[in-house]
Regions:
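N-terminal core-entry segment
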Residues: 1-173
Length: 173
């Protein structure tokens, strides 16, 4: 399997998870928050993770698609971009999330932070920067802003509403 096939498969897997999770209470509640781009990204992120069937990246103990896929898909749709742009942005965000999660593992998790929420926020910024064709300085700024807004305490584990919210709000930041 080529790298492109792996990314396409991971994105399709996330879409299947989002479809399966769309009827869950946490996903329905997220959809009721509004219909702006950020609210739609948050709702899609919640649906994609609420059943916890999405990808798990063990070297960084994170779900890489949960924050990045909804951000890439919905921003690209908003901008009228094609599937190639979605896939390129998704790949960039997926790799950034994985690299950060791997670099912070296991310390990030052991100190009470959830790598998906923290690292995925930056990965989503990378995906968005790619779609918006930001230059390197603008991309750095977008990542810095995302990191300032990142959160994700492990204390929320076991909560039907809070845990999917971390994944979904990472997409929207």
């Amino acid at each position: 399997m080529t790298d492109e096939e792996r990314y396409r498969t991971a994105l399709l897997d996330w879409l299947a998870c989002a479809n399966a999770g769309a009827a869950e209470p946490a996903a329905r509640a997220a959809r009721e928050a509004g219909d702006g781009l950020l609210e739609r990204v948050t709702a899609a992120g919640a649906a994609g993770h609420v059943l916890d069937y999405d990808d798990t990246y063990l070297p960084g103990l994170a779900h890489l698609s949960a924050p990045v896929a909804p951000a890439a898909l919905l921003l690209a749709a908003e901008l009228g971009l094609d599937v190639a742009a979605v896939l390129a942005a998704y790949c960039a965000g997926f790799e950034a999330t994985g690299a950060l999660a791997r670099a912070g593992h296991p310390a990030l998790y052991e100190r009470g932070w959830h790598p998906t929420a923290v690292c995925g926020t930056v990965g989503s910024a990378v995906a968005g920067a790619r779609l918006l064709a930001l230059d390197p300085a603008q991309t750095d700024s977008a990542c810095a802003i995302a990191l300032v807004r990142a959160g994700g305490l492990r204390a929320s584990f076991g909560s039907d509403a809070t845990l999917p919210l971390y994944r979904s709000t990472a997409s929207a930041r």
